[in-house]
Amino acid sequence: MEYRVHARRIDAHGSLATAKQAEVTLDTDLAGRRDAMNPVELLLSALAACMLKGIERVTPMLHFQIDGAEVRLEAVRQDAPPKLTLIRYQIVVDSAETEQRLDL
């Protein structure tokens, strides 16, 4: 599979990423902005989407019945050099399945 994303700077306060027919406003403002995700939040969102898509892929194979699922992520970043030093996540599944089956 191949993927394509195009991102462009709108102004000093934000950028716009597009893929297929979807658009995502990017927080590229040095001061930050509340109405858009910054690069780390986008990375965590992509990781959450991968986990949720994995759940969608596996549940039919295992004949699971789920009513909902959510992923909570948090990251810690150091400043010098700038890098993520920790990513922690929790997956919460709403299902009538037994704990033993959910552990699969």
Where are these regions (language model features)?
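Extended beta-strand/beta-hairpin segments
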Residues: 1-45, 53-104
